[in-house]
UniProtKB/Swiss-Prot annotation:
The lineage of its organism: Eukaryota, Metazoa, Chordata, Craniata, Vertebrata. It is found in: Golgi apparatus membrane. Pathway: Protein modification; protein glycosylation; Glycolipid biosynthesis. CDD domains: GT29_ST6GALNAC3 (cd23975). Its EC number is 2.4.3.7. Expressed in brain and kidney. Observed in the epithelium of the proximal tubules, marginal expression was also found in the distal tubules and collecting tubules. This is Alpha-N-acetylgalactosaminide alpha-2,6-sialyltransferase 3. Disulfide bonds join C80-C229. Pfam families: Glyco_transf_29 (PF00777). It comes from Homo sapiens. Belongs to the glycosyltransferase 29 family.
Amino acid sequence: MACILKRKSVIAVSFIAAFLFLLVVRLVNEVNFPLLLNCFGQPGTKWIPFSYTYRRPLRTHYGYINVKTQEPLQLDCDLCAIVSNSGQMVGQKVGNEIDRSSCIWRMNNAPTKGYEEDVGRMTMIRVVSHTSVPLLLKNPDYFFKEANTTIYVIWGPFRNMRKDGNGIVYNMLKKTVGIYPNAQIYVTTEKRMSYCDGVFKKETGKDRVQSGSYLSTGWFTFLLAMDACYGIHVYGMINDTYCKTEGYRKVPYHYYEQGRDECDEYFLHEHAPYGGHRFITEKKVFAKWAKKHRIIFTHPNWTLS
């Protein structure tokens, strides 16, 4: 009898130990292992967590409304790649790695043609500023015909996005979906815009309007991506201290055009009394979010203290 009880105890302990081991493996796999891979020079996009083997239902994002159908955005991604427009992307040769991500995010009018080796070919979501819509319309066939599987999320102030016929940007978008009926164009609601302003104030302690600044497209991209993505890999984005680092890599502000040095642009906007983007301040916030969410930054790598 004693032997039987001893054997049952051993089996019970073994079962509990095996269960705890599997639980730990799952947690390490889904939360920390992509970061470990990145530390050892392995791209996190190659790691597929256990939970990726099934598809979750699409999430509904009520702050983004389809121009044609007036339906809210439905989007749910596993591992997202957010590709920066920065000149840091030049020569990185991570295009194939980026294209293996389940959802690939780009911003404004950043092209892929001619830059595939560095930034990839595919685009699933493109977040666009109201000021960049005219840039898309300079090459509408490329953005809305050839790339008609891309979801476009447009953000802008109410005066430009109003639907009563007086919203100049909204009118452009409405005309575009008339010409390209398969284009998937969503606009950010006024309520969502206010929410994004509120997040800025909460994170920085500053009122966005009173501080004389505008949120960047990167800010709107992050807020949607954190709602839609299981994990996020950001390519080519510099952190808030990069431009003060000795011997930093000097690159153009955009990878696809010659222009002002990236760091010069950052400093100009950060200290502009009115009408600037607080790029450096935003990067501090992104680093804070990365400690709470599954977000990694590479090319260059970020060290999160």
